[in-house]
A protein has these predicted regions:
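Catalytic cores of the polymerase beta-like nucleotidyltransferase superfamily
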Residues: 1-159
Length: 159
C-alpha cells in the first residue's frame, strides 16, 4: 500500500490518499475498456492528469464489468476537445466533453471544486473534486496506466 501526501498550512507533509497497487486491488486489465484506456493515455501523453472515476471503479473492485467509463482530468473542456477530434462539448452549468468511439460515448470532465460555493464551471484539483462526489464508493480514481486505485475518502474500505 502506498500513500499520496500533500502539505498542511505549515508546510508539513500530511497523508491525503491511500494508493492501492495492482496486487492489492486485483482489477484485471482486460476489464478496462480499451477506448477508455486510450482516452486516459492520450490525455497523459499531452501532459494532463487523467483517471477513470466513479461507478466504473466501484464495479471493477467488486468484480463486475462496468456499463460505462467516466474519465476525469485536469484538462479544461476546450483542451480536451482539441485533443479528441471525435468529441463535443456539452452542458450549460458545468461543461464536459463527450468523446465518441464508434457507438460508445465516454464522458470526460474536468476536476471540479465547490470551494466558492458555485455549482457551475468552477474547475479544481483532484483533492477538491473528491469532496463533491456523492458517496465514498463513487469517489475512487483508477489510473489504468499505473494500475493504481487512489482513495482519498475510504471508499475501498466501504465497499
Amino acid at each position: 500500500m502506498l500513500y499520496r501526501y500533500g502539505k498542511d498550512n505549515n508546510g508539513r507533509p500530511v497523508k491525503k490518499a491511500v494508493v492501492y497497487t495492482r496486487e492489492e486491488h486485483l482489477i484485471p486489465a482486460y476489464k478496462i475498456d480499451p477506448d477508455a484506456f486510450k482516452i486516459v493515455q492520450r490525455l497523459k501523453d499531452n501532459g494532463y492528469t487523467a483517471y477513470i472515476v466513479g461507478g466504473a471503479v466501484r464495479d471493477l473492485l467488486i468484480g463486475k464489468t462496468p456499463k460505462d467509463f467516466d474519465i476525469v482530468t485536469d484538462a479544461t473542456p476546450s483542451k480536451i476537445k482539441r485533443i479528441f477530434r471525435n468529441s463535443r462539448i456539452i452542458g450549460r452549468r458545468f461543461r464536459l466533453v463527450h468523446v465518441i468511439f464508434g457507438l460508445k460515448i465516454f464522458e470526460v470532465s474536468t476536476f471540479r471544486s465547490t470551494i466558492d460555493g458555485s455549482v457551475g464551471n468552477s474547475f479544481g484539483t483532484i483533492d477538491e473534486d473528491v469532496m463533491r462526489r456523492d458517496f465514498t464508493i463513487n469517489a475512487l480514481y483508477y489510473d489504468p496506466i499505473l494500475e493504481q486505485v487512489i482513495d482519498y475518502v475510504g471508499g475501498v474500505r466501504d465497499i
